[in-house]
């Protein structure tokens, strides 16, 4: 497992932010974390990256105990924060040089890694451009490039597409998929955009009021999202997989006709991610 969390607690004054949280994330997966404002997403990611201390609980990252192996964990993980984390008066290349040096990279190794990070995020043509002139999409891509400098086995991305145009969002999502597929990097992805989570992630969890209240694979969610229920005149009910082939659907309705039954109601599937999210976290607005 990439990450194993058991019984994590975090309090701020009298408020419980993470409440006996348990979570396991598979190595090599793209894991999506959803939650309303104030659910504890950023706090959880901050704890896993040693920005905020936990109050209680056990955390193992790539087999390392987080209380005993901070150096080892930091060397194999990286956080791409929601805010821009680079110097606007420096060029893209100069920023990567600076942050690469902080990781202890020097000489040819450093410059080879910079070229790789620029290529992975398609920033080669902007390498010598001052980043203060970058669009929102370019800034987000540079954030990711910096996050790749230490060749992380786990990459945390906290709302990495906030405030950018749809084309840039789409490009960044494909960059993230490519990082996962080519490097085998475990991705932990937080977002308010459910369509991003559905597109990217192998596993999806919902964090609400400090607890994991939902955790499933995308495959399982999709399987349940394709089942329609047919209520018949004899009070029975049949389920039909809307993703199955045409013959299976024809056979279902043929069998209904052969039994001289009538369809009283067809209930289409409602188990898409948005409906699951709203049903669990409720529909009231949150501050």
Segments predicted by a language model, with ranges:
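Conserved ABC transporter NBD signature motif
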Residues: 57-68, 72-73
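Conserved ABC ATPase "signature" region
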Residues: 97, 101, 108-126
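Catalytic Walker B motif of ABC-type/P-loop ATPase nucleotide-binding domains
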Residues: 155-159
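Short, charged/small-residue-rich alpha-helical element at the C-terminal edge
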Residues: 218-287
């Amino acid at each position: 497992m990439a990450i194993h969390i058991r019984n994590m607690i975090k309090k701020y004054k009298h408020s419980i932010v993470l409440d006996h949280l348990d979570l396991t994330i598979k190595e090599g997966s793209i894991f999506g974390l959803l939650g309303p404002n104030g659910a504890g997403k950023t706090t959880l990611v901050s704890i896993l990256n040693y920005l905020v201390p936990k109050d209680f609980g056990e955390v193992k990252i790539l087999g390392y105990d987080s209380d005993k192996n901070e150096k080892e964990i930091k060397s194999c993980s990286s956080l791409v924060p929601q805010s821009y984390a680079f110097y606007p008066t420096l060029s893209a290349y100069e920023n990567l040089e600076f942050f690469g040096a902080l990781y202890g990279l020097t000489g040819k190794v450093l410059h080879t890694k910079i070229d790789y990070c620029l290529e992975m995020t398609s920033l080669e043509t902007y390498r010598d451009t001052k980043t203060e002139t970058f669009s929102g999409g370019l800034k987000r891509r540079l954030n990711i490039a910096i996050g790749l400098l230490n060749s992380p086995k786990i990459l945390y991305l906290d709302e990495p597409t906030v405030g950018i145009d749809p084309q840039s969002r789409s490009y960044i999502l494909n960059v993230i998929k490519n990082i996962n597929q080519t490097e085998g990097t475990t991705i932990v992805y937080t977002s308010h955009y459910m369509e991003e989570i559905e597109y990217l992630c192998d596993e999806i969890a919902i964090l609400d009021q400090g607890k994991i209240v939902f955790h499933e694979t995308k495959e399982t969610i999709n399987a349940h999202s394709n089942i329609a229920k047919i209520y018949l005149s004899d009070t029975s009910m049949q389920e039909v997989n809307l993703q199955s082939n045409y013959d299976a659907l024809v056979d279902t309705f043929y069998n209904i006709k052969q039994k001289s039954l009538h369809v009283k109601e067809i209930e289409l599937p409602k188990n898409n991610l948005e409906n699951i999210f709203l049903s669990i976290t409720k529909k009231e607005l949150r501050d």
